[in-house]
Amino acid sequence: MIPAKPFLCVITDEQCSSPVDLALMALEGGAEMIQLRHKSASGKQLFQWALDIQRLCRIHHAQFIVNDRVDIALAMNADGVHLGQQDLQPGEARKLLGTDKIIGVSTSSLTEALNAERAGADYIGFGHIFQTGSKNKLSAPLGSAAISAVVQRISIPLVAIGGINKMNMMETIAAGASGIAMIAAISRTADPEGATRAITELLKGH
């Protein structure tokens, strides 16, 4: 089940030495969803991290999502999977995971958002909204106005991502985002738990 809006999804940072420790700090700070994302880790390492993070998510009553790897999500019964545009199609992932799992899809345009919904996604990640250093981005930021344009055309939740921080996050919620996804704003701070708590408290006060 997708958390009640507005919610925070913390995505693990590949520059972080321990995704499990980061997940724990984010959960202690009140994050409602954790997404394990690590493109270069081995399947064995990802699976172990996934097991550890899922256990923590269960304790904290949070949702656990695996990025890209439907096989790992299936093997360890994760709450869901998040797919990129070049990954398995949502409909195919649904056949493998079943109807009760969460399937998210990364999008960066209205067309991609509409296609993701038609294909059976439960939510879309939409961005990048603001300038970000978490990934190498060649395209210009979409801006919060793009969120408003998309949410008027889809019926599934939109999770805003890309350059979102404590200073601009409420702009995305006001534009219609159901949730926000963060990487650097949590992982690259001296106190990830405190940073998460400050953000979740702002969201609760919305």
Curated annotation (Swiss-Prot):
Pfam families: TMP-TENI (PF02581). 4-amino-2-methyl-5-(diphosphooxymethyl)pyrimidine binds at Q35, L36, R37, H38, K39, N67, S106, K135. Its EC number is 2.5.1.3. 2-[(2R,5Z)-2-carboxy-4-methylthiazol-5(2H)-ylidene]ethyl phosphate binds at T132, G133, S134, G163. Its cofactor is Mg(2+). It catalyses: 2-[(2R,5Z)-2-carboxy-4-methylthiazol-5(2H)-ylidene]ethyl phosphate + 4-amino-2-methyl-5-(diphosphooxymethyl)pyrimidine + 2 H(+) = thiamine phosphate + CO2 + diphosphate; 2-(2-carboxy-4-methylthiazol-5-yl)ethyl phosphate + 4-amino-2-methyl-5-(diphosphooxymethyl)pyrimidine + 2 H(+) = thiamine phosphate + CO2 + diphosphate; 4-methyl-5-(2-phosphooxyethyl)-thiazole + 4-amino-2-methyl-5-(diphosphooxymethyl)pyrimidine + H(+) = thiamine phosphate + diphosphate. Keywords: Magnesium, Metal-binding, Thiamine biosynthesis, Transferase. Mg(2+) binds at D68, D87. Condenses 4-methyl-5-(beta-hydroxyethyl)thiazole monophosphate (THZ-P) and 2-methyl-4-amino-5-hydroxymethyl pyrimidine pyrophosphate (HMP-PP) to form thiamine monophosphate (TMP). This is Thiamine-phosphate synthase. The lineage of its organism: Bacteria, Pseudomonadati, Chlorobiota, Chlorobiia, Chlorobiales.
